[in-house]
Amino acid sequence: LRRRVQLVYQNPFSSLDPRQSVFDIIEEPLLNFDPLPADERRRRVHDMLERVGLPAAVLPRRPHALSGGQRQRVAIARALVLQPQVLVLDEAVSALDVTVQAQILALLETLQRDLGLTYLFISHDLAVVRRISHTVSVMHRGRVVEDGPTEELFHDPQHENTRELLAAVPGRTEIVA
């Protein structure tokens, strides 16, 4: 299961080992779950780095030497190196500024299309949810109270908690039609 489902955390700075280089961070899942020859591991690390839009020059660096967006790209590359089917993205863009957030969302959309990934995208940011999700589940007190196709849920919420959640969004005219 751990090989097929990978997690990308909200704060890449705290989820990346500060003692490891970017190369070591991305390679680590391969060492733990997929015993491959060193040259194949190196190729996969380079492939993932390229796929997430980072130059090879970052490979020897430590996380503290990277920007927030670069760190999140490293976290995504680490999650993808095992070629999972599902990525769980837990508030994966909430710690980023709006410009970098848009870049990471565009990257996630490209990766999903190119790799056929399924995302479980956990977020409180409904604009982000609307952009990235095909279906949405709304939870209240640990229970799913409504789910459905994204546009349907945003245009015609059925559950009171969903309506309240959407009504509470600043500038909600952009969120709810």
Model-derived segments and their meaning:
Residues E40-A57, L166-A167:
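Conserved ABC ATPase "signature" region
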